[in-house]
């Protein structure tokens, strides 16, 4: 494999696309056309390395690959960075785009521009990337290339007159696209003679090499004899190995030079030592300033994860630590619940991220887990003028100590076919949304901009959005600010005891209907006991809804044949006394379905 190329012959580019617009398939085509992987090793979605990515057909972890291509007798190096398309993983997109000079904007010829695509294009434009529009799936019978080109021009303002038309599935137009990448995307800029400055844009854990950093060399060069300074931590490390990225194997190299992309092994035990967005430089001759403008990923949604087998708490800790090695956005701390025992409060980027992590914990580490209802972080202003940040409903102070509660809001952009506009606006109003803008992109598609409370979108908003628009709407959001709201804590009491794992923070106007739905569902799920069980929903000390599970009766008079009625009465009275005593000291075991039911109730 050819390794070095002059900087003018390097092209660093990424692919921006919405889920399902054919991004990973196009990446496979480019890899195949450049012969980076032999036909025998080539398989579909070669850039998606996790089983869960292949099953769901989505990209979660951004991957990179180095391709060699000859054009007009010259050898070029094309560094392709595949990015995730789902809204939860937009932090992966933003850091990948920082290390590129250009991006392919891939749009499905049958669907047009989607909300997430617009968000990622704006990140690319902020980074001054050259954007090449690519219309994919042109071989489908319902493809409408001209309309989609017009759609891109109207929505994003990029000239699409000469946009490449391809079919990744049928391998049409791939050669032209590679040549367009070479002629249109600029070569990297940087000073070869300056001190080393390298941006870490991804990191992961390798069982043999430890924590690895995927870097873009901005200035200078790095070799295997060098000592490296990690500017964020101030620690120095020797270089154990340098590699070029390839989905199937790492290709060793003696050095990485200005403009190149590569993998650096420093023999570290954890990715926290090489945080994404940090700068690597030469320990003896450091660069004066680190690379600017990088924000660490912040969790957006929090949930409790508890092992069903309570003795597997330490196994869960080990599993979370292992996943954290590859996922710098995942953070967790131990917590305990009266109902569920010991577990962890885990921060996620969004609901898909939460689902993926839970599924990976169960699949890769054979854990049986239960997740509590997801929540966001609330800003609670207390009467003594102090401020407390609450992410767990059980931490909310008593009502008489609270001056006001502020909840985080997001700005949501939704693109929908106009026939579903009525249903969608009704859903947004139910979710306490405030309309900011409505814009017709063309005769059949509308773009809505709403501000919404974050806790309204973390439960089931995405599912409801898809069902009220038959799956045609696309959705993207960005956090904006905290706003004051009328929020209360809704508790569920079973046999008089508050079940802390079922508590939720909710809008005051929705508390009654949510409480009523909760107790009705719990009545169906909790098995009948030998004593009567009251299920209550309460806000503060006020009970707002109640259901009663009748006791199971044992026929204590079965062995009395005829005879005196007082004998039967005596036995029934004795039974009644026993039940009263049972009710006072009896504990109700809650089935796991009761906790899962909370997530399903609207």
Swiss-Prot record:
Topology versus the membrane: Peripheral membrane protein
A GO CC term assigned to this protein in UniProt: plasma membrane
GO term, biological process aspect, one: positive regulation of translation
Residue stretches making up the tr-type G domain: 8-189
Any Pfam family matching the protein: LepA_C
Catalytic activity: GTP + H2O = GDP + phosphate + H(+)
NCBIfam families: lepA, small_GTP
Family: Belongs to the TRAFAC class translation factor GTPase superfamily. Classic translation factor GTPase family. LepA subfamily.
PANTHER family for the chain: TRANSLATION FACTOR GUF1 HOMOLOG, CHLOROPLASTIC, TRANSLATION FACTOR GUF1-RELATED
Full protein name: Elongation factor 4
Source organism per UniProt: Helicobacter pylori (strain G27)
């Amino acid at each position: 494999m050819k390794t070095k190329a002059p900087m003018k012959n390097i092209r660093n580019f990424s692919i921006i696309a919405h889920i399902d617009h054919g991004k990973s398939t196009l990446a496979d085509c480019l890899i195949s056309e450049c012969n980076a992987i032999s036909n025998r090793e080539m398989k579909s979605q070669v850039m998606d390395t996790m089983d869960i990515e292949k099953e769901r057909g989505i990209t979660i972890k951004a991957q990179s690959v180095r391709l060699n291509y000859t054009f007009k007798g010259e050898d070029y190096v094309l560094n392709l960075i595949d990015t995730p398309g789902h809204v939860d993983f937009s932090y992966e997109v933003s850091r990948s785009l920082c290390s590129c000079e250009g991006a392919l904007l891939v749009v499905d010829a049958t669907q047009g521009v989607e909300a997430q695509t617009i968000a990622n294009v704006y990140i690319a434009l902020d980074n001054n990337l050259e954007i090449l529009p690519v219309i994919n799936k042109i071989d489908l019978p319902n493809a409408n290339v001209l309309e989609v080109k017009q759609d891109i021009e109207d929505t994003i303002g990029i000239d699409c007159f000469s946009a490449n038309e391809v079919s990744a599935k049928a391998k049409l137009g791939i050669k032209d696209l590679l040549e367009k990448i070479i002629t249109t995307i600029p070569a990297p800029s940087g000073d070869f003679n300056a001190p080393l400055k390298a941006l870490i844009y991804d990191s992961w854990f390798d069982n043999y090499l430890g924590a690895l950093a995927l870097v873009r060399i901005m200035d200078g060069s790095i070799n295997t004899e060098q000592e490296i300074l990690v500017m964020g931590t101030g620690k120095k490390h020797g270089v154990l190995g340098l590699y070029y990225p390839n989905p199937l194997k790492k290709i060793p190299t003696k050095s990485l030079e200005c403009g190149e992309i590569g993998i650096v092994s420093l023999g570290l035990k954890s990715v926290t030592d090489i945080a994404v967005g940090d700068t690597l430089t030469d320990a003896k001759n450091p660069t004066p300033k680190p690379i600017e403008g990088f924000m660490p990923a912040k969790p957006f949604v929090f949930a409790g994860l508890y092992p069903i087998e309570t003795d597997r708490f330490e196994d869960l800790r080990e599993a979370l630590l292992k996943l954290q090695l590859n996922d710098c956005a995942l953070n967790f701390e131990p917590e305990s619940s009266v109902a569920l025992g010991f577990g962890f409060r885990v921060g996620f980027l969004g609901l898909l991220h939460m689902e993926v992590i839970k599924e990976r914990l169960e699949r890769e580490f054979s854990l049986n887990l239960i997740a509590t209802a997801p929540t966001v972080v609330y800003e609670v202003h207390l009467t003594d003028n102090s401020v407390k940040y609450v992410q767990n409903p059980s931490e909310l102070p008593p009502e008489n100590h609270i001056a006001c509660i502020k909840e985080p809001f997001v700005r949501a952009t939704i693109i929908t076919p106009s026939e579903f506009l009525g249903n969608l606006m009704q859903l947004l109003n139910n979710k306490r949304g405030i309309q900011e803008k409505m814009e017709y992109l063309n005769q059949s598609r509308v773009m809505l901009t709403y501000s919404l409370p974050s806790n309204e979108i973390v439960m089931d908003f995405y599912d409801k959005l898809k069902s009220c628009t038959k799956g045609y709407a696309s959705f993207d959001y960005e956090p904006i600010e905290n706003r004051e709201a009328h929020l209360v804590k809704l508790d569920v009491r079973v046999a008089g005891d508050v079940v802390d794992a079922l508590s939720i923070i909710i809008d005051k106007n929705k508390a009654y209907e949510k409480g009523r739905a909760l107790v009705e569902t719990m009545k169906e799920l909790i098995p009948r006991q030998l004593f009567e069980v009251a299920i209550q929903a309460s806000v503060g000390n006020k009970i707002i809804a109640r259901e009663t599970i009748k006791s199971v009766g044992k026929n204590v008079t079965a062995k009395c044949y005829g005879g005196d009625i007082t004998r039967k009465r005596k036995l029934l009275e004795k039974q009644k006394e026993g039940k009263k005593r049972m009710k006072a000291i009896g504990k109700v075991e809650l089935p796991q379905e009761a906790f899962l039911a909370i997530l399903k109730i609207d």
